[in-house]
Structures are given as C-alpha cells and as structure tokens.
C-alpha cells in the first residue's frame, strides 16, 4: 500500500512538474538534480539505524524503549549536525553544486532531509508497535498535503496572479516555481513532525554508548547496501549537469532525461509484472 501511494504521488508530481516547468528553463533538471542528492543524504543520515532498531527492539534481553531512545538520539544528533554544517557553509556548498544564485535551495532541502531522516525512526516505531492505521494515515495525509501544496503554488497561484493579482502578489513570484516545489516539501516535512509528538515523549532520553555501538556495527552493512542501491538510481542525475560546459544546457538536458527515464521505469514495472504473472501461472 505504501509503495502504491508513493508511486501514485510521484506520478502525479512528475506529470505536474513536466507540464508546468518549461523544458527550456531547466527547472525539472534542477528538481531532479537536487532530489538525487537529497536521496543520497537520506541514506547517509539514517545510516541503517531503522533496520538496527527493528533488530535490537525484537532481541530478547534488550529494552525496546532504550533501543528506541538511542535510535532517536543518534539519528537526530547526526541530522542536527548535518543541518548546522549546511547552514554554516551554505554558500560554498551552493557554489560547489552550481546553485550559487539560489543557496536557499540547499538550505531548504538540508532541513527536509534532516526531518525525514529523523522521522524514519518514529515511523519504524509505529511499525514495531503494530499501528498500521496511524502509519498509513500520516503517509496518506502527507501525500495529499504535498500534492495540494504543489497544485496551489504551481497552478492556482499563477492563475490568481493573472486574474486576481492582489490576492497573491504579496508573496508569489512567477519566476520562482522551482523554489515553491522545495518550499512545499519543507512545509510537509515540518508539519509531519507534529503527528509524532505522542511517540517522542513518555520515556527517558538516555544514551547507552555500549548499546549504540552494537547497533551501529549491526547497521553499517545496511548503510553500505543502501548507498550502493541509491547511487545506482541517482548518480546519473547527480553528475549529468557537470558533463556540459554550459550549466543551463546541462539542466535542460537533465530535465528531459529524467522525465523520459520515468517512462522507462513504468515500462520496466509492466514488464516485471508480466514476468511474475507468467512464471506463477499454472
């Protein structure tokens, strides 16, 4: 269910982005490039601790709440350090990634990936406690909210700006569509934190170094596998713009490439479904 919901959201968002962002603007290329780095950082900041939490929470002789507290403290601490470093060296990082004119893109997505990384642990806790309704409700509300905000900024605001400019002119910039995509993501990630307030209180936040060390050692292979998997999916979108002397042309071509690759993914899904059906048929 979760995969189908996320897949539906991605399909709707990609269709919206390719329709609203002109190919010549390179906007979809920017979105694809930034989200590729975001996916990589999400794997790094969780460093396999979600799997480690499940392993040790279900292990006899371990206190599940102590395991949960150590998972929250470790992932939360790493995420906070990551955000602070990104904000401290924001302009150099933006220059390195060729977003010197829009360092706020880096700042917003750094906060998004930090929030999403931290929230992986409460989501895992809901699964551990066998609370699928709240898990699915948060996911569903986040998806609906994300789509709604994208529709608001990318479709409704441009229409209002033309027909009733006074209603949106005080905050809306028609040339900042890519920025509104990242703003929408940040809003949803921040609001989602409030749903986890009950899961973030009622127990002692005490770091157990011995337990944490064992959890990190167990989770490290998961981190390596996660990095290999995510790089296989995203490294092309990370390096694509750097293959062109003209940065803008690189983003334009990346947008086209990323959009067409989504079609290939859908074709691969249908092919795989056909093979599974064929091999399981009597």
Regions found by a protein language model. Give the residues of each.
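Single conserved hydrophobic/aromatic residue that forms the stacking wall/gate
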Residues: 1-7, 12, 279
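Alpha-helical transmembrane segments of multi-pass membrane proteins
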Residues: 40-41, 76, 80, 84, ...
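Helix-loop junctions and terminal segments of transmembrane helices
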Residues: 45-61, 260, 264-282
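Membrane-water interface segments that mark the loop-to-transmembrane alpha-helix transition
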Residues: 8, 33-34, 43-91, 104-107
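Helix-terminus/linker motif at the lipid-water interface of multi-pass membrane proteins
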Residues: 13-27, 94-95, 227-266
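Short membrane-interface helical motifs at transmembrane helix boundaries
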Residues: 15-18, 81-100, 157-169
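Interhelical loop/hinge segments that connect adjacent transmembrane helices in multipass membrane
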Residues: 161-180, 191-233, 243, 252, ...
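Alpha-helical transmembrane segments of polytopic membrane transporters and translocases
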Residues: 27-45, 221, 253-272
């Amino acid at each position: 269910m979760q995969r189908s919901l996320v897949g539906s959201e991605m399909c709707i968002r990609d269709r919206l982005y390719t329709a609203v962002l002109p190919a010549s603007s390179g906007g979809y290329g920017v979105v694809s490039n930034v989200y590729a780095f975001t996916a990589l950082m999400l794997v790094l900041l969780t460093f396999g601790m979600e799997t480690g939490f499940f392993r040790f929470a279900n292990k006899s002789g371990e206190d599940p709440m102590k395991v949960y507290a150590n998972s929250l403290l470790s992932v939360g601490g790493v995420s906070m350090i990551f955000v602070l470093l990104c904000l401290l060296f924001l302009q150099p990082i933006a220059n390195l990634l060729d977003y010197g004119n829009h360092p706020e893109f880096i700042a917003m997505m750094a906060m998004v990936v930090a929030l999403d990384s931290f929230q992986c642990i409460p989501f895992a806790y809901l699964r551990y406690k066998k609370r699928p309704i709240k898990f699915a409700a948060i996911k569903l509300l986040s998806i609906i909210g994300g789509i709604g905000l994208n529709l608001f900024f990318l479709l409704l605001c441009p229409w209002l700006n033309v027909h009733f400019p006074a209603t949106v002119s005080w905050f809306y910039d028609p040339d900042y569509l890519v920025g509104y995509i990242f703003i929408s993501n940040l809003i949803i990630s921040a609001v989602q934190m409030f749903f986890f307030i009950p899961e973030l209180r009622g127990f002692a936040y005490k770091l157990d170094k011995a337990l944490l060390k064992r959890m990190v050692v167990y989770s490290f292979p998961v981190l390596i596998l996660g990095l290999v998997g995510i790089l296989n999916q995203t490294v092309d979108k990370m390096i694509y713009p750097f293959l062109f002397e003209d940065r803008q042309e690189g983003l334009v071509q990346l947008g086209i490439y990323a959009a067409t690759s989504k079609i290939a993914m859908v074709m691969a899904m249908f092919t795989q479904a056909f093979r599974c059906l064929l091999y399981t048929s009597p």
